[in-house]
């Protein structure tokens, strides 16, 4: 069993396998245990009271914490370089809770407009129903975020690599802007995963994930996570972040910045939005995600190799009108891929056919190896038409703002042999 005492010095690949679990000291089991329990016994009455007052650490109820979940949280935090993380039932829950931890009715956040369709709907339609305004900016122009910031702004939000557009955001520049105004930068790092990019190293304060995708990697398990860098000075901005700096009457007056210090944000995320609205991850799902993470580096290398090979093939095909993959030197965001991701742009690729929407439909229906579905980040290669699936609820102007065209086909490359993938694409293009 691995000795965790030197784990901070481990390379990424080693952390992916060992971080967060050193083996069971009682049974000597080396596989992650699944603690399938609802609640946990208190040593005595005072122990229970101290747990509920956040005076001591420990387990209370699986809606807010679980030992299997805790192992996953330690691993994700180690891979992202944060002080702690919170695992949740889905990526959407992670995004929602990251915002609800610091924002309330009357507040706003500033976000890139190029977002995953589910996130865009959350920001454009659901959060405003709760009084939280989302102001959209152009990821290509960091200064466009700054003009939207005011005294009620609680965060800047972006995706490292956008889904489905595949665009790359200059997170370092956004971090500078956010910090100049005393607000945190929240980054969705789902598409590159921490293997390709660690946003905290470039100034991000909070990282969110749909662990369903590349981290889990096998299309079996829905999960999400929030990672806290522990670096944002919440206590220095008491007026802007009152919920972290004033007594919480629901916890007998605890002040999170005083009780939890650098972990104030992630602590409140657990004991307020998670406790009160309950998007808890199941122990079995936490176990599944941990298994997936063990092979993350191997999968991401193969996925990136396949994606570049497919992008090169599509770029030279006469029926393809355009190809959008940031791993190509011709892509306008390629310099950012080199800066933040060592030249590897993950597995999201999109392109358009010269026959437009009809040709795209014929192409998708002719696929034999690629699976037609809306997930990404699987070991299997996947294809979808965003305008009629992931972004179907968006109107024409919203589609344009999100960078989604009617002829766009999105591919999520897996780990199959590249020659087989290209052969399937070739025959489907011939049928289109």
What are these model-predicted stretches?
Residues 277-280, 285-291, 295, 301-380, ...:
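Conserved small-domain helix->loop->beta segment predominantly found in fold-type I
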Residues 1-59:
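N-terminal glycine-rich, Lys/His-bearing helix-loop that initiates the first secondary-structure elements
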Residues 2-8, 16-18, 22-25, 85-316:
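Conserved PLP-enzyme active-site core in the AAT-like
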Residues 2-3, 83, 124, 133, ...:
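PLP-dependent enzyme catalytic core of the Aspartate aminotransferase-like
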Residues 39, 229-232, 353-356:
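Short loop segments at secondary-structure junctions
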Residues 227, 350-352, 412-414:
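Short hydrophobic/aromatic beta-strand micro-patches
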Residues 39, 44-96, 118-126:
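Conserved N-terminal alpha-helix of the aminotransferase class I/II PLP-enzyme fold
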């Amino acid at each position: 069993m691995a000795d965790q005492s030197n784990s901070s010095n481990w390379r990424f690949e080693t952390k992916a396998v060992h971080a967060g679990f050193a083996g069971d000291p009682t049974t000597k089991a080396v596989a992650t245990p699944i603690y399938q329990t609802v609640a946990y016994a208190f040593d005595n009455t005072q122990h229970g009271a101290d747990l509920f007052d956040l005076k001591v650490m420990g387990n209370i109820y699986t809606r807010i914490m679980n030992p299997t979940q805790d192992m996953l949280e330690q691993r994700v935090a180690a891979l992202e370089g944060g002080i702690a993380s919170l695992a949740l039932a889905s990526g959407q829950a992670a995004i929602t809770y990251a915002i609800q931890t610091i924002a309330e009715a009357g507040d706003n956040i500033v976000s890139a407009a190029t977002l995953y369709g589910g996130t865009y709907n959350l920001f454009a339609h659901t959060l405003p129903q709760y009084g939280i305004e989302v102001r959209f900016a152009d990821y290509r122009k960091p200064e466009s975020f700054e003009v939207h910031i005011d005294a009620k702004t609680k965060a800047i939000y972006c995706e490292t690599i956008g889904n489905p557009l595949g665009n790359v955001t200059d997170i370092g520049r956004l971090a500078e802007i956010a910090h100049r105004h005393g607000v945190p930068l929240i980054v969705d790092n789902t598409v590159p995963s921490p293997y390709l990019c660690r946003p905290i190293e470039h100034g991000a304060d909070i990282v969110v994930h749909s662990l369903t995708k590349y981290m889990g990697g096998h299309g079996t398990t829905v999960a999400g996570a929030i990672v806290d860098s522990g670096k944002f000075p919440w206590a220095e901005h008491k007026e802007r972040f009152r919920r972290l700096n004033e007594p919480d009457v629901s916890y007998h007056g605890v002040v999170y910045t005083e009780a939890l210090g650098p972990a104030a944000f992630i602590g409140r995320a657990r004991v307020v939005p998670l406790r009160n609205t309950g998007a808890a991850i199941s122990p079995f799902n936490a176990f599944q995600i941990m298994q997936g993470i063990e092979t993350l580096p191997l999968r991401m290398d193969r996925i990136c190799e396949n994606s570049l090979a497919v992008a090169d093939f599509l770029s030279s095909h006469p029926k393809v009108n355009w190809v959008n993959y940031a791993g190509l030197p011709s892509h306008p965001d390629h310099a950012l891929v080199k800066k933040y991701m060592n030249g590897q742009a993950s597995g999201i690729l999109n392109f358009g056919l010269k026959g437009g929407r009809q040709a795209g439909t014929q192409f998708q229906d002719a696929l034999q190896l690629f699976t037609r579905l809306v997930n990404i980040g699987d070991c299997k290669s996947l294809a979808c038409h965003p305008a009629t699936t992931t972004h179907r609820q968006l109107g024409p102007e919203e589609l344009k703002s999100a960078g989604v065209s009617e002829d766009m086909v999105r591919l999520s490359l897996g780990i199959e042999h590249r020659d087989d993938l290209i052969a399937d694409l070739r025959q489907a293009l011939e049928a289109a």
